[in-house]
Amino acid sequence: MTSLFFFVLLFSSLLISNGDANPNYKEALSKSLLFFQGQRSGPLPRGQQISWRASSGLSDGSAAHVDLTGGYYDAGDNVKFNLPMAFTTTMLSWSALEYGKRMGPELENARVNIRWATDYLLKCARATPGKLYVGVGDPNVDHKCWERPEDMDTPRTVYSVSASNPGSDVAAETAAALAAASMVFRKVDSKYSRLLLATAKDVMQFAIQYQGAYSDSLSSSVCPFYCSYSGYKDELMWGASWLLRATNNPYYANFIKSLGGGDQPDIFSWDNKYAGAYVLLSRRALLNKDSNFEQYKQAAENFICKILPDSPSSSTQYTQGGLMYKLPQSNLQYVTSITFLLTTYAKYMKATKHTFNCGSSVIVPNALISLSKRQVDYILGDNPIKMSYMVGFSSNFPKRIHHRASSLPSHALRSQSLGCNGGFQSFYTQNPNPNILTGAIVGGPNQNDGYPDQRDDYSHAEPATYINAAFVGPLAYFAAGRST
């Protein structure tokens, strides 16, 4: 008991909120899901709520004589990168699976967002036998322009992987997304669920049979934007873990075992999936009491010990205001992803009355929940500069985000094309963006808790789908009134 009290005392100052009341988590949850409408590519439906967006990318895939319309633009540009898009989809699906009962009416909005992605991913997987399409748009040209997706005139180059040009990382992540989504739709659309799962199995087999990194196959088309820096074995473990959860087929358990133990990371992101796989597999050890997965439970707890402040093995920095700080570029992507894992592992711990040790300190579920809550509250405005890093949440939020469509006149107000360079006049102005991308979470503050709110500062001012996707689960947890 002494070690537990000492551990809690040591980092209690980090967990104490500076605010007098909790943020409105239900509002934040709703807006975090609404954000995805602003990232849509393809023909927009009548129910589109973010009305300053219009249909775009309607010829995507035509360069390869296939239909690759739909999906999401990853961040503030007009390119569809499937590796982060599939990860976004997996995390949205995991959120719905773990926290759907706590989402209330927002669960249907989550399903809509998931399906917008999976409809596109199904096209990518099924359009051409022996190929998996993994992206649309030339990032090197796109990033030289500042134009709306509705009238972009940059090349819509199509990228794919195959047996001769493998991409196990993007293939296994696509399989993970489809498998996870198949469980989301199992009870509400069984036919669609079966299609998702059947396709997930095929794509996962492709990833296993033809191993290699998509960065090697596609080089400058995906690097340095979304290089697979961690390699592809983490995605193989992650993808197989999701197929195992969706099917309970021992084939996937045996394949996971054949991969070995994997790395011991202190991060979780669209690139490095090991920590996510460990937490997902630890579910079987804890909830199903399956001793075959004990090593992954231990790996998950080793990861958490690297995150918790004042843990003997902690390798995570925190700002003075209490925010996890991993890397300078888009730090909040790591904060939201890690926070999801903390909240979810705490959920498993509570269900089984489980505790574990970081050195001599006994870790209880509420230690993880308290740290998660501190990160969520910080993002929503409980921080030294009282800035909400979610656009449109509270009165003080980023006004000049690095996002083409948000920063330029809407297509409804100015239908004439701006051209590749026509938007830079808006880019360089200090005026707030004319279109509010409600719910978008930007890259976040610097290590000193500061945020300059400059449009050209993409490291801090650019939103991304995967930042939001991982935030949905923790928001749903706290929106349901779970503060401990």
Swiss-Prot record:
It catalyses: Endohydrolysis of (1->4)-beta-D-glucosidic linkages in cellulose, lichenin and cereal beta-D-glucans. Specifically expressed in root cap cells. GO terms for molecular function: cellulase activity. The keyword Hydrolase applies. This is Endoglucanase 9. Its main location: secreted. The active site is at residues 77, 402, 453, 462. The keyword Secreted applies. The lineage of its organism: Eukaryota, Viridiplantae, Streptophyta, Embryophyta, Tracheophyta. One of its GO terms (biological process) is cell wall organization. It is found in: Secreted, Cell wall. It comes from the Eukaryota. Its EC number is 3.2.1.4. Keywords: Carbohydrate metabolism, Cell wall, Cell wall biogenesis/degradation, Cellulose degradation, Glycosidase, Hydrolase, Polysaccharide degradation, Secreted, Signal. Belongs to the glycosyl hydrolase 9 (cellulase E) family. It comes from Arabidopsis thaliana. It holds the Pfam family Glyco_hydro_9. Residues 1-21 form the signal peptide.
